[in-house]
């Protein structure tokens, strides 16, 4: 159904006293323009990562995604306070430039002289509670596209959540022809284009763009776990990975007439998320969640079950509730093994080829782990030395998150969709 509830959730603080962002980082995020709602800003913070390192402050793809969610989580607590006073208090050195939330600017002297807003962690707000958003459905949609992506990242302490749905009825109309237009394009390129389309105008529930986005997501995830490939396609389509297990995987939309999988009738869906911290360095997983956010901005997806999220994320209207869909987690490295096992069983990959892919995946995981743990240590040292200017460059994680998790069960659940 079409979305009727426009709630969003802000970040947790990861053990800090305040939102983990400081003046230097906020200035860096807004250097291209003062409006966080600009399409270019949005596409920047979901698509960085074509190279693994970008800058000292934004070291990887997941950094800007997390940092922008911190910036919005802090600054939006200004207008969402009781009585909706938008310009009488600052977050860091920033205030909104107008009640319409057009942009963020340095606060005037009289506001700078007053204490900054002490934002709260894990807050849930409703866009319709702020009059200027409630009155302008088009602007609310544009804002909510981004706030949906923020929510999908912050419902749990792990990586961003994606929605995967398989339903033969989605292929009706001109979707198949539109999908052919993307033949030979990468998943990242397709996702980027669809995000632009969503920002330009709201998608109708189960309209052409909404259905095509869900098909693209299902093709990606079924390919990601090795269920579909050149010998077992989904209506001739699948995503081919150039170097599975590499630090920067590229997934290309491909076609094959060899064999098409038999798809059971009916509508089946699930939610999936990476639980290992190396999602921060995988732009495909980030873009998958962002496409899910585009869907959420116009459509009400199934609820995520309360038991799949921490207490602070339960019973959020339109997002989580009792008897909802289970949220399936996986370790990025372990999913490479699941992928290889399926391709080998289907005769697409030899044991020797699997050994090569898994050796590369081991090297990639160690490289990413070394980088992420180094940045985390540096951030901890910085925060101890600067208690009044704390920040995290990547979403906080624990060593336990590098474990295998429920990867096998998640892989089987995705495979069961067809």
UniProtKB/Swiss-Prot annotation:
Cellular location(s): Virion
Keyword entries, A-Z: Capsid protein, Inner capsid protein, Virion
Statement: the UniProt record of this protein carries the keyword S-adenosyl-L-methionine: no
GO CC, any one term: viral inner capsid
Quaternary structure note: Interacts with protein mu-NS; in viral inclusions.
Miscellaneous information on this protein: Mutant ts447 is temperature-sensitive.
Family designation: Belongs to the orthoreovirus sigma-1 protein family.
Protein name: Inner capsid protein sigma-2
Gene behind the chain: S2
